[in-house]
Amino acid sequence: VHRRSIDFSQLECQPGDPDSELQPFSFLTDAPMHNKVECWIAYTNPETHRIILDNIQRSPLYGGMIEGVGPRYCPSIEDKVVRFAGKDRHPIFVEPCGENTEEMYLQGASSSLPEDVQNAFYRSIRGFENIEIMRPAYAIEYDCVDPTSLEATLESKVVRGLYGAGQFNGTSGYEEAAAQGLLAGLNAARNALGKEQLILPRHTSYLGTLVDDLVTKGVMDPYRMMTSRSEYRLTLRQDNADQRLTPIGREYGLVQDDRWAKYQHTQSILEAERRRLHETHLRTADLRAAMEAAGLAPAAEGGIAEELLRRP
């Protein structure tokens, strides 16, 4: 929708995190990060829901044109109105599509209803009375392979040399597709070169968990990766991803020399600190005094600093 057609004075501002709290995804990012844009939140209302329900049979999702099972974790607005009939409102997040654009994306308002119905129900929302749709919402239905017909390398068992990723494999989501694409592309290249292919066990990564779930369990609806799917989630953390996966990437030719040198430097710092903690002994009296000064329950006795870090 067009930014200038929205009355932001009727919406709730959703500011981003302070710059000081921003954390990059990659250990390689060292450039300063800034939150330059704000998001907003609007809410549907009973009139919005009435318009949607009055036209529900015009939705391909409910009129029989689309028969596939939709995504479980990001349902359309008509799905939410039907499934959660007891709720008198649903949130819609208004997100800028970029730093220098007038396009705003309505997160939580995906729909397959015709454009005239979309215009009607969007304009029933406070702050959206004069909204202009730049590109209407739409629904798609796509086929996928049975993921149990894939090897753990993401190669098809039926068509050798064919590797799949993303929606083709029955998943939903950008990160899920990107991760599978990395693995499938790597293995396709190594297969072409006659080299050993990479299989990631469940305990190594969320990608390993995702692939194992796909090829052993299959899917009934578009698969999304969540921490709750992994029995190893306490050890699969973003702060140790570098240590878990960079050596594997190096072994399989994905990590260049400069990145490997930075990784080794970081590991040497960590190892030096581990040695320092292992060699540091704290007397009981000194430890109790320090903990009491910090407002913590005093330790029963002193010991090696490395072991004291395990204290809950």
Name every feature range the model reports, one short phrase each.
Residues 167-175, 231-233:
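Glycine-rich phosphate/pyrophosphate-binding beta-alpha loops
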Residues 1-94, 98-99:
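Rossmann-like dinucleotide-binding core of oxidoreductases
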Residues 1-8, 69-75, 136-145, 198-214, ...:
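A glycine-rich phosphate-binding loop feature that marks nucleotide/adenosyl-phosphate handling sites
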Residues 177-200:
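Internal hydrophobic alpha-helix adjacent to the cofactor/substrate pocket in enzyme cavities
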Residues 105-169, 199-212:
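A glycine-rich dinucleotide-binding beta-alpha-beta segment and adjacent secondary-structure elements
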Residues 229, 241, 246-312:
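Extended, charge-enriched "interface" segments that sit outside catalytic cores
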Residues 2-40, 45, 194-255, 261:
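Mid-to-C-terminal Rossmann-like scaffold of FAD/NAD(P)H-dependent oxidoreductases
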Residues 1-5, 125-126, 130, 183-191:
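Glycine-rich loop(s) and the adjacent beta-strand/alpha-helix scaffold that form part
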